[in-house]
Amino acid sequence: MEGVPKSLPAIVKAFRIQEKVRGIGFDWDDKTQVWDKLLEEIEELKVEIEKGDNDRIESEFGDVLFALTNYARFINVNPEDALERTNKRFIKRFQIMENEIREKGMDMSEMSLTEMDVYWEKAKMKYLSK
């Protein structure tokens, strides 16, 4: 694992590790196998959530993220870029929602999740129309 800096963000590091081991042939043949592995890891996470052991939950959650990162590699998606793009989109939509609610003279802290969700859906539509 030499050549993979320890200081990298975890998702970037996982991606680099997977690229590195691919170079020596330790890799899946196709994306279907990777998807199946991801589903297996999700099932293992569900089991640990039911048991309630936080250490095991964190471990299995990490396995899910690692498998999902590997799947991203197979479908030619940079997971770091994809997550950052989603973060930015979420922030923009949330800001639109906040503004809509503020313009109506309402306070988000006094709204139910169901009420906020109506504004969230409006914000999504407004964002998509830009």
Located regions from the model:
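Flexible "arm" and connector segments at domain edges
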Residues: 1-61, 65-130
